[in-house]
Amino acid sequence: MPLTVGTKAPDFTLPTKTGEGPKQIKLSDNFGKKNTLLLFFPMAFNDTCTTEMCGVSLDLSAYGSLSATVYGISGDNPFAQEAWAQKEKITVPLLSDYEHKVAKTYDVAYDSFLPQMNLGMGGVPKRAVFIIDRNGIIQYAESNDDARALPNFEKVKAKLAELK
């Protein structure tokens, strides 16, 4: 069960890699400024994840107008994320939860991802969404065990509009 609405969002610091170089992103740096939209997804170079992140990238200005900072989070290393973002023209900042600590803290990590393939991929993030308000409180939480199911972005936008 993922973290619930009304609880304080656990703080974290994760790396990102862009053309400007690597940097660390700390969740609480947004507190007091903007709402934060966290989009957990299983992995780069996957059809459903590409569809999700490309769609959000195309709509990034709409999220900005709703006073939200958006981050995509996967267990990929920052270099793989950067290569994927460049290939697919993804503009959402991607954070690397390479050790799966944040996915586990937010309780959205698979015990075993794609168990039928016997790859031993535990800890991979589920597809999940958290909206965290300016005070660091979770205002929306959605998680899905089916990695092919996209979040309900209409509900996400409606909630962000309420918080604006």
Locate each region found by the language model.
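Chalcogenol-based redox active-site neighborhoods
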Residues: 1-164
